[in-house]
Amino acid sequence: MINNYIDITVRLLENILDNEADYVKEAGAKVAESIENDGVIHLFGCGHSHILTEEVFYRAGGLAAIHPILHEPLMLHEGAAASSVLERKNDYAKTFMAEEDIRPGDIMIVLSTSGRNPVPIDVAEIAREKGAFVIVITSLQYSASQKSRHTSGKRLSDAGDIVIDNGAVKGDAVLKSANFDIAFAPTSTVTGAVILQSIFAEAIETMVNDNFTPPVFISGNVENADAHNQALVDKYNERIPLLGMNL
């Protein structure tokens, strides 16, 4: 099974390289422009999609200007099934997005592989109303195969200024076994991480070419990194309180 899973995942990544690279580069340019003008990069996802927002937060080799919107009832540790119920509620996003410090010139990256549930769609639309540029990572194939749960009939792909397709199949899982009817081994976490890191790599290269020093963390396990990292925490702590919380 390892050969099958890796073969399929590699093909998905090759497809992203062939068909989504221009959108990734465009997204990277927008991220660079935002950071060069004191903007912040917000990320949001429900359920397992939220994992990707934490993957790029306070990350060795990653950008400091990253703000994951971590609304705990929509994560998994306060009730996995309950989070799925909440994700399907129209207008629920208003209960937590009103207080988010999203400003004109910021970037909002919203992740949802199915793209059908109301909360990610509403997050994208509220962020745009606040002046953010919206980047969406979703599966166009998966989304098109399912009816939208949003009252407007929209899917997440309808709410993005840039839409990047992670290529996930319907249901996300790609493997099957004889004598077992349920597909297993999802791919969207792998492809989503690659897409996000590629966007930020493009952004960092753009900033370097613009003679702007990218705000990139060094691993805290490398000697003499602490002062460098603390300076970045101090720079962004007002906009991203999670960076310095409980210090």
Swiss-Prot record:
Residues 31-214 form the SIS domain. Belongs to the UPF0309 family. Pfam families: SIS_2. One of its GO terms (biological process) is carbohydrate derivative metabolic process. PROSITE patterns: SIS. This is UPF0309 protein Lm4b_02611. Disulfide bonds: none annotated. GO terms for molecular function: carbohydrate derivative binding. InterPro entries: RpiR-like_SIS, SIS_dom, SIS_dom_sf, SIS_GmhA/DiaA_subfam, UPF0309.
